[in-house]
UniProtKB/Swiss-Prot annotation:
GO MF annotations in UniProt: ATP binding; ATP-dependent DNA damage sensor activity; damaged DNA binding; mismatched DNA binding
Gene behind the chain: mutS
Membrane-spanning segments: none
Pfam families on file: MutS_I (PF01624), MutS_II (PF05188), MutS_III (PF05192), MutS_IV (PF05190), MutS_V (PF00488)
Presence of the UniProt keyword Nucleotide-binding in the record: yes
Superkingdom: Bacteria
Key words of the record: ATP-binding, DNA damage, DNA repair, DNA-binding, Nucleotide-binding
Functional description taken from the UniProt entry: This protein is involved in the repair of mismatches in DNA. It is possible that it carries out the mismatch recognition step. This protein has a weak ATPase activity.
GO biological process assignments: mismatch repair
Coiled coil: none
Family, similarity comment: Belongs to the DNA mismatch repair MutS family.
Protein's name in the database: DNA mismatch repair protein MutS
Species of the source: Thermus caldophilus
Length: 817
């Protein structure tokens, strides 16, 4: 259940017992102690006692009081008409909501109106369209045992899957990839304060409690997570659950994209600014298409066959512009068929849902088939379409209880009741005309209210003309209201027929909804096909609009005129080439020249290719990578007590642990978080290790010592820059060979450092360079003068220490011991 504990329910003042309304409230509240109970009273959902105080604080409401003869308690409420907006805010704050509705009309109640909890709402178990985000809305469960068991369920679509992971870092990567709205933790994790604290810092989502099988009874972590997930979801849905076939998935079967890579590449969330890769690609026209595109970005493919099939479909839409525009125009009219099918299977679809199914789904399918041909593979739903056309009015109300849902001529019994109902209605319309004529009262009129029912109303000047058979029911300031025995008889008949019409219309609607529910599998299949069409057309639209090309797959990585798909939207962009094969490519150049952008652009082109998208380049051939690993940009974990350097080393350790010769590795300025000597040593050792592993590695660095590194599969590139009269000019071109210098002082000057500081830095740099050059010359002279055959081992060791001290600019003798 939700982890927001509600505690003591009701407090108040007064000597007497609770009034009946509050007794009913407390009884319902006791059944759902972990939820905030929203209790319908007329046109409002009310809370009382401490719940009222919580509601008022959370939403900024005015706190009032419920007062009876002997009792007073705090009260706060929200109007039912604004429920969706308030509920969304409460769910975002971590509240679970129990919604108690009046389940009988007030006029039919014998005493207190009966109320029941009709909905349990938590962030991860929503099916209501108004409350759901456009993205997938996952509920997750985590358990331990023979590993880390992780299960996901999207209640709104029925997607249900799970995996078994071997490490906590892999668990966090999967959670970051899926971004669940709510997480269930097994008891052994819930009771681990350190784990919970770390988890909350990384994932600000609702943590809820649910019954898990004990570890001893169900040692398999995956089974425990899966079972708890289903039990919790069923409890919130009143036992009804629509779940697609369970899928056991293996993260190793897709391209490995650790959390650090998703963040550094800004796939879903920007590090700065507003743009993301998903934002660039999201030209989808439907909600299921948008969710599918996100899923593709979370799960890039490893196999060439499925990728070529996707690219073929994208290419068709690229080549056939009129077809692409026509399909996208039709897709834009579609409802969220995937979630609508779930509401149908849960028997929660409203009249408007069925109208949307007819008008914004089924009526569009024949038009799509007309454009694409029968090979699109859409199921035949023409029978259901004709049924909905015959049964539903054009624009039905939200609730069937409001009436006017079923079209005239569809159900003979309902038609007969409506005709019978027309007689008493006509009677009251005729009554006003007849009574005006018979009494001579020109202002007489027939009215209705909920207290007195139908009445005859006469204004004060005509009181003397009122016939004796009129029975007074209400006196107002300037008018009186009356009734007649025959009016009451007709009124009772009218109420009886209205109740029969309401009941029959509900029966017909439920049967119609059941007819649609039986097509659930076909509707889900149609939703899947339409979502794929949407993504293919969207990727084609992006490709045409931005000049992307179809990638080829091979052993070499060869990109001609590659561009960064996100940066180029904000500024003029200089395209660059890259060619490598199982090599270590060292990229040097000054800050701000574009090294990091070049690294990111390469990774993004690879990622796009492996979801089946065209890529931002004039030509691209890429290997099928099994993982994309990045160490780009500075970050720290202050809450976890980790420095930038520590976080950097953890990410590098993951690369060394997982990367293979089929991996793409991007490293930017590794080692800069520590001393220069340590940094050079770490960067050199890392470069050697990755070179030995034969990864496709791009290694951006300021350490010019690394340009002397002699490895057989190493090549140097640099980002061009040149000093001109106006200062340093960045060309953003990637050229062969190492950079000639780092231009650090020039960049500092561009950043606005005071002139005297810049001049002092230049002087110090010149002095240090001269000193180092002199030291190196002295080292060389001493080596040339050395006769190694005349050195004892101790003298040789002392000589090496002296050479090292000279190279580092230290006084001789400082390296002893």
């Amino acid at each position: 259940m939700p982890a927001v504990k509600m505690g003591v329910m009701l407090k108040g003042e007064g000597p007497g017992p609770l009034p009946p309304l509050l007794q009913q409230y407390v009884e319902l509240r006791d059944r759902y102690p972990d939820y905030l109970l929203l209790f319908q009273v007329g046109d409002f959902y009310e809370c009382f006692g401490e719940d009222a105080e919580r509601l008022a604080r959370a939403l900024g409401l005015v706190l009032t009081h419920k007062t009876s003869k002997d009792f007073t308690t705090p009260m706060a409420g929200i109007p039912i008409r604004a429920f969706d907006a308030y509920a969304e805010r409460l769910l975002r704050m971590g509240f679970g909501l129990a919604v108690a509705d009046q389940v009988e009309p007030a006029e039919e109640a014998e005493g207190l109106v009966r109320r029941e909890v009709t909905q349990l709402l938590t962030p991860g178990t929503l099916t209501q369209e108004a409350l759901l985000p456009r993205e997938a809305n996952y509920l997750a469960a985590i358990a331990t045992g023979d590993g880390w068991g992780l299960a996901f369920l999207d209640v709104s679509t029925g997607e249900f899957k799970a995996t078994l992971l071997k490490s906590k870092s892999a668990l966090y990567d999967e959670l970051f990839r899926h971004r669940p709205a709510e997480v269930l933790l097994a008891p052994e994790l819930r009771e681990n304060e350190a784990f919970v604290a770390q988890f909350r810092k990384r994932f600000p989502v609702m943590l809820s409690e649910a019954p898990f099988d004990p570890e001893g009874e169900a040692p398999l972590a995956l089974s425990r997570a899966r079972g708890a997930l289903l039990a919790y979801a069923r409890a919130t849905q009143g036992g009804a659950l629509s779940v697609r076939p369970f899928r056991l998935y293996d993260p190793g079967a897709i391209v490995r994209l650790p959390e650090a890579s998703l963040k550094a590449l800004e796939v879903f969330e920007p590090l700065r600014g507003q743009d993301t890769l998903f934002g660039v690609l999201d030209e989808t026209r439907t909600a299921p298409g948008r969710r599918l595109l996100q899923a593709w970005l979370r799960h890039p493919l490893l196999e060439r066959g499925p990728l070529e099939a996707r690219l073929d479909r994208v290419e068709r839409f690229v080549r056939e512009g009129a077809l692409r525009e026509g399909v996208r125009r039709l897709l834009f009219r579609l409802a969220d068929l995937e979630r609508l099918a779930t509401r149908l299977e849960l028997s929660r679809a409203s009249p408007r849902d069925l109208a949307a199914l007819r008008r914004r789904s089924l009526e569009i399918l024949p038009e799509l088939e007309g454009l694409l041909g029968e090979e699109v593979g859409l199921p035949d739903l023409s029978g259901l379409l004709e049924e909905l056309r015959a049964a539903l009015v054009e624009d039905p109300p939200l609730k069937v209880s409001e009436g006017g849902v079923i079209r005239e001529g569809y159900d003979p019994d309902l038609d007969a009741l409506r005709r019978a109902h027309a007689d008493p209605v006509a009677y009251f319309l005729d009554l006003e005309v007849r009574e005006k004529e018979s009494t001579g009262i020109p202002t007489l009129k027939v009215g209705y209210n909920a207290v007195f029912g139908y009445y005859l109303e006469v204004t004060r000047p005509y009181y003397e003309k009122v016939p004796q058979e009129y029975r007074p029911v209400q006196t107002l300031k300037d008018r009186q209201r009356y009734t007649l025995p025959e009016m009451k008889e007709r009124e009772r008949e009218l109420y009886r027929l209205e109740a029969l019409i309401k009941r029959r219309e509900e029966e017909v609607f439920i049967a119609l909804r059941e007819r649609a529910r039986k097509e659930g599998e076909a509707l889900r299949e149609a939703a899947r096909i339409l979502a794929e069409l949407d993504v293919y057309a969207a990727l084609a639209e992006v490709a045409v609009r931005h000049g992307y090309t179809r990638p080829r797959f091979g052993e070499r990585l060869r990109i001609r005129a590659g561009r960064h798909p996100v940066v180029r939207r904000r500024t003029a962009f200089v395209p660059n080439d890259l060619e490598m094969a199982h090599e270590l490519v060292r990229v040097t150049g000054p800050n701000m020249a574009g090294k990091s952008t070049f690294l990111r652009q390469t990774a993004l082109i690879a990622l796009l290719a492996q979801i089946g998208s065209f890529v931002p380049a004039e030509e691209a051939e890429l290997p099928l990578f099994d993982g994309i690993y990045t160490r780009i940009g500075a970050s720290d974990d202050l809450a976890g007590g980790k420095s930038t350097f520590m976080v950097e080393m953890e990410e590098v350790a993951l690369v060394l642990k997982e990367a293979t010769e089929r991996s793409l590795v991007l490293l930017d300025e590794v080692g800069r978080g520590t001393s220069s000597l340590d940094g050079v040593a770490i960067a050199t050792a890392l470069a050697e290790a990755l070179h030995e592993r034969r990864c496709y590695t791009l290694f951006a660095t300021h350490y010019f010592e690394l340009t002397a590194l002699a490895l057989p599969r190493l090549k140097n590139l640099h980002v061009a820059a040149k000093e001109e009269e106006g200062g340093l000019v960045f060309y953003h071109q990637v050229l062969p060979g190492p950079a000639s210098k780092s231009y650090g002082v020039e960049v500092a000057e561009m950043a606005g450092l005071p002139k005297e500081v810049v001049e002092r830095a230049r002087a110090l740099l010149s002095a240090m360079a001269a000193r180092r050059e002199g030291a190196l010359e002295e080292v060389l002279e001493r080596l040339l003068a050395l006769d190694p055959d005349r050195l004892t081992p101790l003298e040789a060791l002392r000589f090496l220490h002296e050479l090292k001290a000279l190279a580092l600019g230290l006084p001789l003798g400082s390296m002893k011991g």
